Amino acid sequence: MVHYGLKGITCVETSISHIDGEKGRLIYRGHHAKDIALNHSFEEAAYLILFGKLPSTEELQVFKDKLAAERNLPEHIERLIQSLPNNMDDMSVLRTVVSALGENTYTFHPKTEEAIRLIAITPSIIAYRKRWTRGEQAIAPSSQYGHVENYYYMLTGEQPSEAKKKALETYMILATEHGMNASTFSARVTLSTESDLVSAVTAALGTMKGPLHGGAPSAVTKMLEDIGEKEHAEAYLKEKLEKGERLMGFGHRVYKTKDPRAEALRQKAEEVAGNDRDLDLALHVEAEAIRLLEIYKPGRKLYTNVEFYAAAVMRAIDFDDELFTPTFSASRMVGWCAHVLEQAENNMIFRPSAQYTGAIPEEVLS
């Protein structure tokens, strides 16, 4: 029997996260991810995912200091970023540059110090590249800012408002980890050969680049832009459904009810955007889409997923579409590293089989 896409196949045991698709729950190390996102900092969430518990005050400060100390880009990385073509997409740049971090010190077994460096430096790579292609002066990281604030600052040169900071932080926390998805699987497969951490997350970045995995928020933005006005929503959505096309930002392969991440992001989008026209349109499109999905796909119970409100949050904090997947990747670096570290603890190389469908040569009698 062939399990296409490995759907329904359990290949590892993990204590990092749990997705309960029937009840709409995402759990990080024994805690509801929604609660962590709404009530804790990115650094606390990252510590939880990496080390299995929330940090004490002292542990948190040490962790913050370590992250801040690893934000600066080495000179060879700056030169590499500058040398890449301006029309090279951001995810290809990120994949290429991260792979260049793989010095001889990165070997099997991976170390938490290596993970901390990758988590800290990835936003710096994204921000440096974005400003370089815009012809803007690079902004050095600031130790006075936390992980999320510093990312925003290095991109824009400004300190975010508290509402914008918390909206971005909520999104990044909810993007840190989501079970055995395609990119996490890629990372664990690579590490299972006793390769190094940089190679593993480089493989994950290559997987994240695919539009079926990392590109959905951009597609949601395009849909909202195509609709434009609330009065156009019904006709647009009906046309899509009648053609059998997918509504971007609705439904999830795992969740059979409301995506808990979407609920948290909706709350933050409303806080930062207030009466913003774009958010008002998004709320209207959500209501219309759910109503029409019940008519066109009765019994399917398709709800808004995280990508829908990720797009709303990113628009509300003035991040352009090109930053969606890189920001997602900077967040997911935490989960990738945690899974790679976990894989190394009880490693076995992945070696599934394939069912051959080609011809068999006839036996020649001697």
From Swiss-Prot:
Annotated S-S bridges: none
Chain's gene name: citA
Phenotype when changing E307D: 5-fold increase in activity
Protein name: Citrate synthase 1
E.C. no: 2.3.3.16
Top-level taxon of origin: Bacteria
Function: Might regulate the synthesis and function of enzymes involved in later enzymatic steps of Krebs cycle. Loss in activity results in sporulation defect.
CDD domains in the cross-refs: BsCS-I_like
One Pfam family recorded for the sequence: Citrate_synt
